[in-house]
Amino acid sequence: MLAEAKRIRDRFDAELRAIYVGEQTEETSQTFREAFAQLQLPIDSTIYYEGGGEPAEAILRALAREKIGLVVAGALEKEVVLHQFLGNVARRLVREAVCSVILFTKPQVKPKALRCIVFIADYSEHGLQALKTTLPFAEAESCERLYVIRIITAFDEARASIGSNAADPRDNKTNDDEEDALEKFVLSAGATEVPIETRCIRGNTGLAASDFVRSVTADLLVVPMRKNIRSLPSNIAWVTDVIPCNLWVIR
């Protein structure tokens, strides 16, 4: 996990700090020094020892107290055929952390490049800034394909079907309108060398997006999420339970 965190540190030219849920002992201090040295990290890197209590609470407390901008953690509690389920700590980080979160499903000592990335678009200002943050990261990862997708559920389409009675005509969009809006959203993020493909994903529920992520064998799913909002929109709420690949929640 520390190797994956170092990769993220390098991508953002940031300072790496560690959170350890437990008491500081000479043994744990030595273990960290050895791990830091192996990864060519400063051996005096900051470690927050959060002794006692429930792990998720301890981590959330440290993130808020130290004003951390991004936390990198492991994702999985269990895995069954075709589905990977978030562990309790990871789930609470996604819902409650005051900062951005990156979760790795299978962290590796020698991290592999994230060649295929899926970004879930929303047309808010935060969503646009999140895409602008994703583009240089994807370029640094030598991303071969960045899918920017818009999730359209049966509920969304039912709401649009009564658009003629809606106060806002933008609620009544045709398929072409949706595709055009998504293209304009991507173009507004600026130029990039990363190959981008836009897709409108339709399904009865937002889980259709999870199916799409698996179908393209994505390495990373990126989800914009505004700060101080614990409840994800219904069409992407599934990411707090089933995680199809590594996950980056941008706050």
Can you annotate each of these PLM segments?
Residues M1-S45, C116-D168, S188-A191, P195, ...:
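Small/aliphatic-rich secondary-structure junction motif
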Residues A167-D177:
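A short acidic, glycine-rich active-site loop
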Residues E178-E183:
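Well-ordered, non-membrane alpha-helical segments in soluble/globular domains
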